[in-house]
């Protein structure tokens, strides 16, 4: 039986085929070269984390396979500005439409409205998606180790690096962490959500954190819903956090809650 991740990767293959048919590689490379300059994603995180505050990557998504509808009518720019006002280091913007309700149009609109770095959050399976991401202004891309093999992970990483982008490498278990650490990116995410079973456990970050050396930057992802979650994960060394669903639901107090999480200790 196929998992949620399997089904996503299946339609990503269709999307990549359509992209290659619709736009030539040369066209995308020219657009990437003409895009606005890269904003340093990792350096923005470090500027806050090195001061012993919590560097937050605040996420925008209208829905998800695990939560269903989160905020289907959301104005992405309004949410992004709330995050920026609250002190977010960076943004994560879902560009997957079928499962998360996002788009590259959302990404571009948000990019024009904020000054902080942005991650294109999607399921990358081909270098052409990386080039497309830079063409739309992305500063960082995501590599999900559970979705691809080591050869492809290396190709995606190298493509992003050539374009000057940062790379967030996402893991969920020990085997994926070992594979991720073979890549040179310092940004190592631990997703507390199992993308195959769609269950969440903060203990995942606690278990995997000791595998990272001091030259890597641990980013705890998923399941962070209050200051207590952050305080718990700070005990294993995390100062960088990706938070989405809970913040999306905070309404008029969203900026205030970002500040509260940033200062939690």
Swiss-Prot record:
Keyword annotations for this protein, in alphabetical order, are: Amino-acid biosynthesis, Aromatic amino acid biosynthesis, Decarboxylase, Lyase, Tryptophan biosynthesis
Q: In which pathway does it act?
A: Amino-acid biosynthesis; L-tryptophan biosynthesis; L-tryptophan from chorismate: step 4/5
- EC class of this enzyme? lyase
Q: What is its EC number?
A: 4.1.1.48
Q: Give the GO biological process terms.
A: L-tryptophan biosynthetic process
Q: What is this enzyme's catalytic activity, as reactions?
A: 1-(2-carboxyphenylamino)-1-deoxy-D-ribulose 5-phosphate + H(+) = (1S,2R)-1-C-(indol-3-yl)glycerol 3-phosphate + CO2 + H2O
Report the CDD domains cross-referenced here: IGPS
Origin superkingdom:
Bacteria
Q: PROSITE patterns, alphabetically?
A: IGPS
GO MF term (any one): phosphoribosylanthranilate isomerase activity
Which Gene3D superfamilies does the record associate with it?
Aldolase class I
Tell me which InterPro entries the record gives.
Answer: Aldolase_TIM, Indole-3-glycerol_P_synth, Indole-3-glycerol_P_synth_dom, Indole-3-GlycerolPSynthase_CS, RibuloseP-bd_barrel
Stated family = Belongs to the TrpC family.
Q: What is this protein called?
A: Indole-3-glycerol phosphate synthase
Record organism: Hyphomonas neptunium (strain ATCC 15444)
Q: Which gene encodes it?
A: trpC
């Amino acid at each position: 039986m196929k998992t949620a991740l399997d089904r996503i990767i299946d339609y990503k293959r269709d999307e990549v085929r359509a992209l290659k048919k619709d736009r030539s590689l040369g066209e995308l490379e020219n657009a990437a070269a003409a895009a606005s300059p890269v904003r340093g994603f990792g350096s923005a995180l470090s500027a806050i984390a090195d001061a012993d505050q919590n560097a937050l990557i605040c996420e925008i998504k209208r829905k998800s396979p695990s939560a269903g509808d989160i905020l289907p009518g959301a104005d992405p720019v309004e949410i992004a500005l709330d995050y920026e006002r609250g002190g977010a280091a960076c943004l994560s913007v879902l560009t997957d439409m079928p499962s998360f309700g996002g788009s590259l149009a959302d990404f571009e609109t948000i990019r024009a409205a904020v000054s902080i770095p942005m991650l294109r959050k999607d399921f990358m399976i081909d270098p052409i998606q990386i080039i497309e991401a830079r063409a739309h202004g992305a500063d960082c891309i995501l590599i999900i180790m559970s979705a691809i093999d080591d050869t492809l992970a290396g190709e995606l990483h190298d493509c992003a690096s050539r374009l000057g982008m940062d790379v967030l490498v996402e893991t969920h278990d020990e085997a994926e962490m070992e594979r991720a650490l073979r890549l040179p990116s310092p940004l190592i995410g631990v997703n507390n959500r199992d993308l195959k079973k769609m269950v969440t456990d903060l203990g995942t970050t606690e278990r995997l954190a000791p595998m990272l050396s001091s030259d890597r930057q641990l980013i705890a992802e998923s399941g962070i819903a209050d200051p207590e979650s952050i305080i718990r994960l700070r005990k294993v060394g995390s100062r960088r956090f990706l938070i989405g669903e809970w913040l999306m639901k905070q309404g008029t107090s969203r900026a205030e809650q970002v500040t509260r999480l940033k200062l939690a200790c």
